[in-house]
């Protein structure tokens, strides 16, 4: 089983944690942006089937 030889420094831990948090923040902001563009109908890369509220006659 692999065991680290030396203790990881606090600053390195903070750097790695910030990278991990930044990835999550970017994914969340991208998802929010896509949701906004879909809800306004300005999305060019995501197709949503439009349903009409009118009853068929």
Curated annotation (Swiss-Prot):
InterPro entries cross-referenced by the UniProt entry: Ribosomal_bL32, Ribosomal_bL32_plant/cyanobact, Ribosomal_zn-bd
> Which domain of life does the protein's organism represent?
Eukaryota
Q: Name one GO molecular function term.
A: structural constituent of ribosome
Keywords, sorted A to Z: Chloroplast, Plastid, Ribonucleoprotein, Ribosomal protein
**Phylogenetic classification of the source organism:** Eukaryota, Viridiplantae, Streptophyta, Embryophyta, Tracheophyta
Please name the Pfam families in this protein's record. Ribosomal_L32p
Compartments, as annotated in UniProt: Plastid, Chloroplast
The UniProt similarity line reads: Belongs to the bacterial ribosomal protein bL32 family.
One GO cellular component, as annotated: large ribosomal subunit
* Database matches in HAMAP family: Ribosomal_bL32
Q: Tell me, which GO biological process terms does this entry list?
A: translation
Q: What is this protein called?
A: Large ribosomal subunit protein bL32c
Origin organism is Calycanthus floridus var. glaucus (Eastern sweetshrub)
């Amino acid at each position: 089983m692999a065991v680290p030889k030396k203790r990881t420094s606090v600053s390195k831990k903070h750097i790695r944690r910030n990278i991990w948090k930044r990835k999550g923040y970017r994914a969340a902001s991208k998802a929010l942006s896509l949701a906004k563009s879909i809800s306004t109908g300005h999305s060019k890369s995501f197709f949503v089937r439009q349903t009409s509220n009118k009853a068929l006659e």
